[in-house]
């Protein structure tokens, strides 16, 4: 498949916390959709090795959720570092989208971009500077059409691939119910 500048890159990161100055990325996943939000490619889902010290510094919420999902065990067992995760992800993306073409797509992608900028700059640079943030649409719908909110429920698994799939489904829902296009 030839790279298409109209395709969209969807990304989700799982981190040890919310502060890029002290927390680290522990999982990354990407999907590519066409401009109609049809999934056309799934990138690698990568648990990124971090030290026991980094994992032990996680707060209770992260320990609980990432422990219950099995992510902490996957991170400990992983042999993949951040640079390798970046290289694998970019190798996937190059098949579908030229560098600099796609906005960063997902939920609360401003947070993901902060971590990419700090630890995975080459991957952050692969995206256009714009964001397609589903959470922005959600905030608008919550205020302007609150009854519409009841029609879409997220699982909130805090697993990168499932979170991206839900973000795409959520935008498809808003497109059909709010934008009607």
Curated annotation (Swiss-Prot):
Query: Which cysteine pairs are joined by S-S bonds?
Result: none
Enumerate the InterPro entries for this protein.
Answer: Exonuclease_RNaseT/DNA_pol3, Oligoribonuclease, RNaseH-like_sf, RNaseH_sf
Tell me where it mainly resides: cytoplasm
Q: Name one GO cellular component term.
A: cytoplasm
Q: Looking at the Swiss-Prot or TrEMBL record, what is one Pfam family this protein matches?
A: RNase_T
Q: Where in the cell is it found?
A: Cytoplasm
Residues annotated as the enzyme's active site: 129
> Entry's SMART domains?
EXOIII
Q: Which CDD domains match?
A: Orn
Q: Name one GO biological process term.
A: DNA metabolic process
Indicate yes or no for the key word Nuclease.
yes
The answer to whether keyword Hydrolase applies is yes
Q: Keywords for this entry?
A: Cytoplasm, Exonuclease, Hydrolase, Nuclease
Q: Which NCBIfam families match?
A: PRK05359.1 (NF003765)
| Function field | 3'-to-5' exoribonuclease specific for small oligoribonucleotides.
Cite the PANTHER family for this sequence: OLIGORIBONUCLEASE, MITOCHONDRIAL
**Per its UniProt record, what HAMAP family does this chain match?**
Oligoribonuclease
Record's protein name: Oligoribonuclease
Annotated organism of origin = Shewanella sp. (strain MR-4)
Designated gene of the protein: orn
């Amino acid at each position: 498949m030839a790279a298409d500048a109209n395709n969209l890159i969807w990304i989700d990161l799982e981190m040890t916390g919310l502060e890029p100055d002290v927390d680290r990325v522990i999982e990354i996943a990407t999907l590519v959709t066409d401009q109609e939000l049809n999934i056309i490619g799934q990138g690698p889902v990568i648990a990124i090795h971090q030290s026991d010290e980094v994992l032990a510094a996680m707060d209770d919420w992260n320990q609980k959720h990432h422990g219950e999902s099995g992510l902490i065990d996957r991170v400990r067992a992983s042999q993949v570092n951040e640079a390798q995760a970046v290289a694998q992800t970019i190798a996937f993306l190059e098949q579908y989208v030229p560098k600099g073409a796609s906005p960063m797509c997902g939920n609360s992608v401003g947070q993901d971009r902060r971590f990419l900028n700090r630890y995975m700059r080459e991957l952050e640079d692969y995206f256009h500077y714009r964001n397609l943030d589903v959470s922005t649409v959600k905030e608008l719908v919550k205020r302007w059409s609150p009854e519409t909110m009841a029609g879409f429920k997220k699982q909130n698994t805090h697993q990168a691939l499932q979170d991206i799939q839900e973000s795409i489904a959520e935008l498809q829902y808003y497109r059909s119910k709010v934008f009607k296009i």
